[in-house]
Amino acid sequence: MVERLARALDLRAGTTVVDLGAGTGKLTRLLVPTGARIVAVEPLAEMRAVLEAAVPEAEALEGTAEAIPVPDGTADAVTAAQAFHWFDAARALPEIHRVLRPGGRLGLVWNSRDLDDPLQARVEELISPYREWYPQQMTQSWREPLRASPLFGAPDEFSVRWEQELTRDELAERVLSISAIAALPSARRAPLLDRIRSVIGDGRKPFPFRYRTDVFVFTRSSDRPSNERGTSFQG
């Protein structure tokens, strides 16, 4: 996935990429082999401290997508992994446009469970009643501000499917990381986690769970007609 993203964003030595909402650097560290200069923007000091220790090659700055702390035309590319749906798009899109150079590209990345996988579908069936809302990356409502914006053209898209082996307890921990589940009273949370564990069965052997990574690459509209159609392909 990262190799295809790097090609789509034309990341290489001599280019600069700004990683927004960088968190602890999960995507940031994967960009290092491209040879590009990496500027990681993260508002939380605790997250930045982890990022700086994990990815010393990156320049970590305090900031947000709505107030990016770099000059105009700094970046050849801007990335955001698992983050764009949290941005205030009305403010973030002009900022991203501002920091991109002519020809610059915006790469948005999301990981999600592959619901074509029967195991993942069963997990979703169990947890969906407990969600008060669905993340925008699942409903795709994050697309609307970009569709309406004159600042970026239609995206090029690709998806990559991958597997991760999880034990019963690792699966339960993964589900517990969902804020809506973690916030449940213990009397409701514990039985749910027991049902989640039962998806795998009684054994301790890890089971493969399928995931997918969806990538969307947008080009600055001043360099690409806004009515140009993007492409979509899967890997």
Regions found by a protein language model. Name each.
Residues 16-20, 24-67:
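Class I SAM-dependent methyltransferase SAM/SAH-binding core
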Residues 24-26, 144-235:
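Conserved Class I S-adenosyl-L-methionine
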Residues 94-164:
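Conserved catalytic/acceptor-binding region of the Class I
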Residues 66-77:
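A short acidic, Gly/Pro-enriched loop at the edge of an enzyme's catalytic core
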Residues 1-15:
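Conserved alpha-helix/loop element of class I SAM-dependent methyltransferases that forms part
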